[in-house]
């Protein structure tokens, strides 16, 4: 029998289309229960992911880690040794993750550059635009496959980000059964209006996902696929704004104390959004109670004014 927290037993004789969880994940769960000969399948009733992602620690054995084992060879620098490459565009390589530690997922890695010490903050405009356009295209390709309930794209950078390798890369992960967007809505991206140019705008969240300082770069979905001059211009502007935001997060926000950051990409309500945030030790309010925190108005105003100056100068 399939089990999940706060679940209700649902007999199979009812039509599955009438169940509250009318989606691909429920169909897969129902089929799995039938194969096991179960008379009932347990249906999750609360909003959010159907269950926690399952991490298989055995599959993480031998995984390189620049934070715990510095000085070890970088697998992304050994291009000739890379396997299961999905797409390539010059130095940019999208491939399956060798260490697929999460069950019922497809974990992939997008290597941004051949330069081990590069980062979004250091790319010249041509390389920056190429990286962002390639990443958005690979993300869309995985979504368009229809093989996953949701597809997540994100970037870890630094020892507190959750990442293990320094070499610049992103991750694109297809979730077979979970809705990675279940707890996310537009409220997490609205707040202080910092900057707008063309169809690209930047905000600071006042209802952040985690806190304390989350900056959002927002543009209409699908721009990266457009060939019209205005689409190319705004896609490049999206990348330029992101670079300026990350530079601010690392070099100026909170006195430039941050050594780590995350980027999280979303498609929501017809928009493509990337959320950038510095990473610190996670607050116990969030760990224990899922309570996010937001900086006070004076701090938000200061950040918005200074960030606006940088965006006007560089994006």
Predicted regions: what they are:
Residues 2-4, 14:
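Low-acidity, Ser/Thr- and Arg-rich intrinsically disordered low-complexity segments
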Residues 169:
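Conserved, mostly hydrophobic/aromatic
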Residues 5-7, 29-31:
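Intrinsic, low-complexity polybasic segments
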Residues 37-161, 165, 173-237, 246-315:
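Active-site microenvironments that recognize anionic phosphate/pyrophosphate groups
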Residues 6, 17-19:
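Charged/polar low-complexity intrinsically disordered segments
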